[in-house]
Amino acid sequence: MTARLRPELADIPAYTPGKTVPGAIKIASNETVHGPLPSVRAAIEKATDQLNRYPDNGYLELREHLASHLDKNLGAGAFTPEQIAVGCGSVSLCQQLIQITSSVGDEVIFAWRSFEIYPLQVRTAGATPVQVPLRDHTHDLDAMLAAITDRTRLIFVCNPNNPTSTVVDPAALKRFVEAVPPHILVVIDEAYVEYIRGDQVPDSFGLVRAHPNVVVLRTFSKAYGLAGLRIGYAVADADIVTALGKVYVPFSATSISQAAAIASIDAADELLARTDQVVAERDRVTAALREAGFTLPPSQSNFVWLPLAERTLDFVRRAAENRLVVRPYGEDGVRVTIAAPHENDAFLEFARNWIGQP
């Protein structure tokens, strides 16, 4: 090929999604087992009547729905539509946030291991990823603070953390945000927040209101079950939202995805009630794995993390032989999605047999 490409791209790997194998149980991509509600299906079908038209590039109706939804849960006037940005999944908003803050020579801090897209997007922007090792499978916030330099522009906090399933203590997160210099953007990536239970639920939107440099990311892919439609949103200071609009790819969230998201907001209580079923299965699977002899951190997500180290690849290979597709992370461990009960049973049967082998 004679085209002159950016040479630095040669050293950047492509993002690797969870595999799909026909006939196998896929527990690799943290998808919900539930399909869309009838009301959401109806909204999707109705939206197909206008496929000859461009989608609303300003996401006006969706942003108004989101603002009203936040008002309902947080109190009147919590956020305005001008404080909400919509993207083609929260992953696209991650990229936009990097674009508006960081360029060559700048630094972006995040825990590691964490969401695999962070280092790829940072390097693509020409910036430098600063990976801070996890402590006990969760964010080491003190070490992340110590990693801040005069070149730091952005910090990602993936909470709950993907792939290790853990959550940051809310009080510790508040202290961390207060300690970060106000010119550095702190992005709290909450793709799995709906699965957090007990006193670990963060007041992330309160942090946005108290600190103009804090951004919260949410997605419709997980608890809302719209992974195939790719739509997410950010809640932030209005100036940040305006900047995000300057690096946004026009029309990237379709009319269908917007209609489905609006209908999902209207049915939020019913959809979020489904997470209780996932949490119950998560607790059952966790207890069974520990009883079988596995060591794993407490999960606050819709998946569990098995830190298998050098045994990771053998576990993945043998799982595939048993028609189970799980997600490996090098020689660190395996992420396993909480699925339907019968699928979880199949996985547990395999896991018990595997750990019992010499």
Swiss-Prot record:
Keywords in alphabetical order: Aminotransferase, Pyridoxal phosphate, Transferase
Enzyme class: transferase
A Pfam entry, by short name: Aminotran_1_2
Catalytic activity: an aromatic L-alpha-amino acid + 2-oxoglutarate = an aromatic oxo-acid + L-glutamate
InterPro entries listed in its UniProt record: Aminotrans_II_pyridoxalP_BS, Aminotransferase_I/II_large, ArAT, HisP_aminotrans, HistidinolP_aminotransfase, PyrdxlP-dep_Trfase, PyrdxlP-dep_Trfase_major, PyrdxlP-dep_Trfase_small
Signal peptide: none
SUPFAM superfamilies with a match to the protein in the record: PLP-dependent transferases
EC annotation from Swiss-Prot or TrEMBL: 2.6.1.57
List of residues that carry N6-(pyridoxal phosphate)lysine: K222
UniProt-listed CDD domains: AAT_like (cd00609)
Entries under HAMAP family matching the protein: HisC_aminotrans_2 (MF_01023), Phe_aminotrans_2 (MF_01513)
Subunit structure: Homodimer.
PANTHER family: HISTIDINOL-PHOSPHATE AMINOTRANSFERASE, HISTIDINOL-PHOSPHATE AMINOTRANSFERASE 2
Similarity annotation: Belongs to the class-II pyridoxal-phosphate-dependent aminotransferase family.
Task of the protein: Aminotransferase that catalyzes the conversion of aromatic amino acids and 2-oxoglutarate into corresponding aromatic oxo acids and L-glutamate.
Protein name: Aromatic amino acid aminotransferase
Native source organism of the sequence: Mycobacterium sp. (strain KMS)
